[in-house]
Amino acid sequence: MKSYQPKSLLNDLQYYITPPHDCSYLDNKSARMVFLDPIHRIDVVTLSELSRVGFRRSGDFVYRPECHLCRQCLSCRVPVHDFNMNSLQKKAWKRNQDLRMSIVPTHAATSVHYQLYERYINERHADGDMFPPSLDQFEKFLVHSCTESFFLELWKDDRLICVSTCDLMDDGLSAVYTFFDPDENRRSLGVFAILKQLEYVKSIDLDYLYLGYWVPHSQKMNYKSQYIPLELLLDGQWRRLNRALSQEEISQLGESLMTILPSEWNSMIIK
C-alpha cells in the first residue's frame, strides 16, 4: 500500500492508494482507490472539501477512484434549486404522498433498520458483492461513520419501508446508500428517496445533493443521469449537464471517458 498525496488544499491529511483490483462497475476493467487514512475523524467542512474534489464516504473510509487510463467514474451532484422533475419522477412523487419522513442519526440504528437492509440485499442484490448480508457488514457500511451522518426514513403508517443514509455537508447532503422494502416495487422508492433528499436539502437552505459517481457505461449507475441538471466533476471543474443523455449518446462516448470535456458536449448540453 502506497502513501499518496492528492493535489488539493487537503495535503495536511494522510492518504493511501490501493493495488489494482477488479472494477465493481465495468467488466474486464481494473480499479485503484485513493483513500483517506481511516484514523482521521473528519468534520463536516473537511468532508465537504473532499467531496468537492471527488471523494466519497463508505463506512469509516473516504475514497476516490484513481484508475490508470480510465476516467469513467464521474463525481456528480444535483443543484437542488434548479432541479426539475421529469414525468417519471413526478409520478413517483405523487404515488408516495402517503409516506411520512423522519430523520435519525445512524448511531441510533435498530434491528428494524437491519431487518429491512437484510431483506433488501437478499431479494434485490443476491448476485452482488454485498451478498450475503450480515449485521457486521451493515454496521461497518452504514452505521459507522467518520463524520455527521443520519438516516432519512420513510414510513407507511407504523411500518418502515425505506431508509437513505446521508452525510451532512456544508453545501448540501451526500447520498450514501438507500435500501427499501422489496415488496413495494410499484412505489419506485429508489426514485422517491432521492426526491425526498433533494427536498430536504432545499428545506435546510443548502445547494447540492451529491450522488456519488455517475458511470455512463454501467447500467446500474446510469440512473443518476436522470436528475437534471446534473453537475459533473470534469478536469477539476464542476460542469453542468442540462439534459439527460440518450443511450445512443452514451454509447458514442467510447470505452474511455476522460476527465476533459468532450468537445461535442460543450456547445450542446453543458454550460
UniProtKB/Swiss-Prot annotation:
A molecular function GO annotation: arginyl-tRNA--protein transferase activity
Regarding protein family, the annotation reads: Belongs to the R-transferase family. Bpt subfamily.
A Gene Ontology biological process in which this protein takes part is: ubiquitin-dependent protein catabolic process via the N-end rule pathway
Extract the Pfam families matched here. Answer: ATE_C, ATE_N
Q: According to its UniProt record, where is this protein located?
A: Cytoplasm
Question: What is the recorded function of this protein according to its Swiss-Prot or TrEMBL entry?
Answer: Functions in the N-end rule pathway of protein degradation where it conjugates Leu from its aminoacyl-tRNA to the N-termini of proteins containing an N-terminal aspartate or glutamate.
Chemical reaction(s) catalysed: N-terminal L-glutamyl-[protein] + L-leucyl-tRNA(Leu) = N-terminal L-leucyl-L-glutamyl-[protein] + tRNA(Leu) + H(+); N-terminal L-aspartyl-[protein] + L-leucyl-tRNA(Leu) = N-terminal L-leucyl-L-aspartyl-[protein] + tRNA(Leu) + H(+)
Which branch of life, at top level?
Answer: Bacteria
The UniProt keywords, alphabetically, are: Acyltransferase, Cytoplasm, Transferase
Name this protein carries in UniProt: Aspartate/glutamate leucyltransferase
Question: Where is it mostly found?
Answer: cytoplasm
Query: Which Enzyme Commission number(s) are on file for it?
Result: 2.3.2.29
The record's section on InterPro entries has:
Acyl_CoA_acyltransferase (IPR016181), Asp_Glu_LeuTrfase (IPR017138), N-end_Aminoacyl_Trfase (IPR030700), N-end_Aminoacyl_Trfase_C (IPR007472), N-end_Aminoacyl_Trfase_N (IPR007471)
Q: Which GO terms describe its cellular component?
A: cytoplasm
Q: Which gene encodes it?
A: bpt
